A protein has these predicted regions:
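Outer-membrane beta-barrel proteins and related beta-barrel translocases across Gram-negative bacteria
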Residues: 33-38, 92, 103, 208-210
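Cleavable N-terminal export/targeting peptides
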Residues: 1-32, 250
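Generic structural motif
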Residues: 36-40, 98, 221
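Outer-membrane beta-barrel transmembrane domain signature
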Residues: 46, 56-61, 90-95, 117-250
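Short glycine/proline- and aromatic-enriched beta-strand/turn motifs that initiate or cap beta-hairpins
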Residues: 25-74
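Surface-exposed, interaction-prone regions with an acidic/low-complexity signature
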Residues: 108-110, 202
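Mid-chain, structured segments of secreted extracytoplasmic proteins
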Residues: 71-107
Length: 250
């Protein structure tokens, strides 16, 4: 009788263990679907600006996406430690991945032109990223509109709005080496001055030049360089174009 009860107890424990293990495995499989990418970026205007992106598949051709950029790690430290976070939806169409997102900034660049303390909800950033990869050719288009979400200006101060976009295309000449070209523009798209009037629009920079990318497995780096097409006397950037990125995919 004792042995029967013991066997039943062991059987129940075994079933419980198998059930818990199965649930744990299922949860781990779900968690494994989450993809993360880390980009350690450094350029002539923003300085160091690391970014993280995340995606979780909803269907075979769609993903829920998230992103964050620490602009304040570089020159944007003076803009209320400017920070950006957003989310969106990625759609795959052949060799294209189309990812509209909506971001928000924290800091003081957009809400007061860097004059007042940093705030949550400094700006809103509707943006679009389109990636192309057919195993041989690669490309990316990005466009974002940085608009002041809150107005924290005092008399004579202005909110600021920006348009930031780039396009790069390249070709893999070997499995680990890609060569291509990059164009990027940052434009001040105006703003409202407290007390009346608007801030004039102006190009901060227009970068153009080649890039070289080396990669293997989950990581790699890209170096882009060239010239700034804007007039140094009217732009906010007087440097040549150079940008270095280290990227890792998990």
């Amino acid at each position: 009788m004792f042995m029967i009860k013991l066997n039943k107890t062991l059987f129940v424990l075994l079933i419980s263990f198998v059930s818990i293990f199965s649930v744990t495995q299922a949860q781990e499989k779900k968690e494994d679907k989450l993809s993360l990418s880390l980009s350690l970026n450094h350029d002539a205007f923003f300085g160091f600006n690391p970014a993280v992106t995340a995606s979780y598949p909803v269907t075979k051709k769609t993903d829920l996406t998230f992103y964050g950029i620490q602009w304040g790690a570089g020159t944007a430290r003076a803009w209320g430690n400017w920070t950006e976070f957003g989310l969106g939806f990625n759609m795959k169409a052949g060799d294209f991945a189309i990812n509209p997102q909506l971001g928000f900034t924290m800091g003081n660049l957009l809400s007061s032109g860097t004059n007042q303390p940093g705030i949550v909800g400094d700006g809103i950033v509707p943006n679009l990223t389109i990636n192309y990869d057919d195993k041989k050719n690669i490309g990316q288009f990005y466009a974002g509109y940085y608009a002041a979400l809150r107005n924290k200006t005092e008399a004579g101060e202005s909110t600021l709005n920006y348009v930031h976009y780039w396009l790069n295309v390249g070709r893999r000449v070997t499995p680990w080496l890609a060569l291509g070209a990059h164009y990027e523009n940052l434009n001040l798209a105006g703003g409202k001055i407290k007390g009346g009037g608007n801030t004039n629009s102006a190009d901060y920079y227009k970068w153009i030049g080649p890039f070289i990318q080396v990669s293997k497995g989950i990581g790699g780096m890209r170096f882009s360089f060239g010239t700034d097409l804007t007039d140094d006397e009217t732009s906010n950037s007087n440097s040549d174009f150079y940008k270095l990125s280290f990227f890792f995919n998990f």
